[in-house]
């Protein structure tokens, strides 16, 4: 998988990809990350890539010419072009899976300032938002995309690790504990120390349903629950 990130602030991207799972994925050649400085595609003085908006108003707007030149410099027939923007569809695990399973090259355009020339959308395949709030620029959103997609690719993390994470199978992850066994009178559940793997598995499945019902009931899809989880779900719903 190759990511091409078009940005005004390459250092933000560089600082992140030098750490943790992303760095290991690059070292394993599971992913490639290409950082493209948008200013390099400007033909104006001081590498200007923004200007005042027609019709007046506050805030600067990213100009179409450098954006399209940057996109076309890396785009191939196998590319998908994403734009980080508040008006995009909200990123979720289902969208992440679609990108990780179906594309070899993802171009991410980082939005900035007041926005971008609307004509840019003719060259964009998907607009993506990371939530209903405003951040300074699209770099953080682009890194969230890279991180979430990369961890689902082969040889990045163990398959078992991400299959048991929150949002897989439309459930939150079960509670986890480590040492010490007791802290301020709160103990680790005894079942986790029992050594009985079947009971531990059963407890974890129960806790996934309980936690999801309490904290994110909107996620649950009963068609994806196993028999034991469905029993817990029905019991919990009956108690509410």
From Swiss-Prot:
Q: Tell me what organism the protein belongs to.
A: Mycoplasma capricolum subsp. capricolum (strain California kid / ATCC 27343 / NCTC 10154)
Write the protein's name: tRNA (guanine-N(1)-)-methyltransferase
The annotated subunit structure for this chain is: Homodimer.
Tell me which Gene Ontology terms the entry assigns under biological process.
tRNA N1-guanine methylation
Keyword Iron applies: no
Q: Which UniProt keywords are given for this protein, alphabetically ordered?
A: Cytoplasm, Methyltransferase, S-adenosyl-L-methionine, Transferase, tRNA processing
Q: What class of enzyme is it?
A: transferase
Could you tell me what this protein does? Specifically methylates guanosine-37 in various tRNAs.
Task: Show the stretches that span the lipid bilayer.
Answer: none
**Keyword Lyase part of the UniProt annotation:** no
Gene Ontology molecular functions: tRNA (guanine(37)-N1)-methyltransferase activity
Task: Kindly state which reaction or reactions the protein catalyses.
Answer: guanosine(37) in tRNA + S-adenosyl-L-methionine = N(1)-methylguanosine(37) in tRNA + S-adenosyl-L-homocysteine + H(+)
Looking at the record's lineage, which domain of life comes first? Bacteria
Alphabetized Pfam families for the sequence: tRNA_m1G_MT
């Amino acid at each position: 998988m190759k990511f091409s990130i078009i940005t005004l602030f390459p250092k933000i991207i560089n600082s992140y990809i030098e750490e943790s799972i992303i760095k290991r994925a690059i070292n394993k050649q599971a992913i490639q990350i290409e950082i493209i400085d948008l200013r390099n595609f400007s033909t104006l003085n001081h590498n200007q890539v923004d200007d005042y908006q027609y019709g007046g108003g506050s805030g600067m707007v990213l100009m179409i010419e450098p954006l399209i030149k940057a996109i076309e410099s890396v785009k191939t027939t196998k590319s998908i072009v994403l734009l980080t923007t508040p008006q995009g569809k909200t990123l979720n695990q289902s969208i992440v899976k679609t990108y990780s399973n179906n594309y070899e090259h993802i171009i991410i355009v980082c939005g900035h300032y007041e926005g971008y020339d609307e004509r840019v959308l003719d060259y964009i395949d998907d607009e993506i938002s990371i939530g209903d709030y405003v951040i300074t620029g699209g770099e953080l959103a682009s890194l969230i995309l890279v991180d979430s997609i990369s961890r689902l690719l082969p040889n990045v993390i163990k398959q078992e690790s991400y299959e048991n994470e929150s949002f897989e199978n439309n459930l939150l992850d079960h509670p986890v504990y480590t040492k010490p066994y007791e802290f301020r009178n709160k103990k680790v559940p005894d079942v986790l120390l029992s050594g009985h793997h079947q009971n531990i598995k059963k407890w974890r499945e129960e806790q996934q349903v309980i936690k999801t019902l309490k904290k994110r009931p909107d996620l649950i899809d009963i068609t994806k629950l196993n028999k034991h989880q469905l029993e817990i779900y029905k019991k919990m719903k009956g108690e509410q």
